[in-house]
Amino acid sequence: AKRDAAKCDAAKCDAERIRMQNLVDWMKRRMDKCLPGMMISLSIQFFTLPLVAYYYYEIPVYAILLNIPVLALIPYVLGLAVFGSLTGQIAFLQPLSFALCRVCGWVLHGYRWLCDASLLLPGARMITGKPSEVRVVVYYGLLGAFYYVLWCGMKKKQRQMCTKGAQAEKQEWIRRRFGFGLGLVLVLLLTFLFVRGKPEFELDILDVGQGDAIYLCASDGTNFMIDGGSTDVKKVGTYRILPFLKAKAIRKVDYWFVSHTDEDHISGLVEVMESGYAVGTLVLAEAQKEDEKAYRLAELAQKNGIRVCYMKAGDVLGTRKEDVVNERNRAETFRIECLYPTNNNDSEDVNDRCLVLYYEDENFSAFFGGDISSEVEEQLVSAGKCRQTDVLKASHHGSKYSNSDVLLHALHPRLTIASAGKKNRYGHPSPEAIARVGESGSTFYSTIDYGRIRVRFVDGEMVAEPYRKCL
């Protein structure tokens, strides 16, 4: 009885092993049939990836998987479409033509639905930044070399295989070589397209027309934005601010400061938050906490998982003293101090309740005054809060009622940069303000003439790099 039971168990094990082997064989046959489609899909992705990254600054992560069913269905869809077009020329076959074309439409709409649905999945887009032309050329050269070597190997292997099992052996050889080559190409892709060096200090005054949008990369790599809006550039967040951030491969803005809630300072920020782009903390002036616009902005931020905090005069954001452990680390320290307003400021003019910020690190300093008037500027100077500055972001877009002599002489900026729109109705930047800046010895730049203006250090020297030359 025991021997019979043992034989029965052995038979069951053999049957189970056979079933598993059949399943494995079936899966291998399926993989062999899918392999050509997967190779074509991967080849298309590898070929188009640099161009997509170069022009859109991000890549769709799930595109490779989505292309597999498309490649499988395309021959049938094209065949049905051609046959439907031909039958449509014959009167009594037009109902058939309509039905065939309707089926093709369903397939295409289904694929579009899959594409839209894939973008809702976590990690659907990967921000890569804009690769340099050199990296793109090197990438294509290496990719071409890889495919040439693979093609030569396949031809050689094909000549060697003359036995009955040649086709299966060829499939196995392709699978192994393509898998190895795929890994190699991925390494090259990461190396030549997406690997970037350590972030360096950079200040950018974006060209957003009649508005403000300022990007600041601190000396330790922390990403800041100050304001983000416009009254004359439509969809400024979608078509100016987000493309700028993505082109620089910035996947998250750590802190987004809002000087005040006028449309020319927040319209783009609202679009950015609604798009789902990652923002760590939204920073508002505590004196504006009860304003309706500020309340709605904070509510939108919290709805999108963004932390909201409020600053008042005397608050400081930056590197803690205990975090400074050596001289190398000291060079990466920074501080952003709120100079104005106090938490009990009750000025009726929202411009005079603007968040005024002063950035400072080992080599650079900048003053950001929002839209404050000359009266507030004089208050800050009288309180001893203004000291020598490398860059002054011109207050109120270069208005003649701001950027006073008192402030300019206290800050003594090397550069003064105004953000304004062409032919704006306010006359910004005003000739009076430009004249005062010139008299103070500061070099004046305007986004009207120069477009985006970048300030960075080259060989230890601060330089201003306008996007275009002044005509």
Annotated model-derived regions:
Residues 2-22, 67, 86-471:
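Non-globular, low-confidence helical/coil segments that flank catalytic cores
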Residues 1-4, 17-82, 124-128:
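Membrane-embedded alpha-helical bundles of multi-pass enzymes
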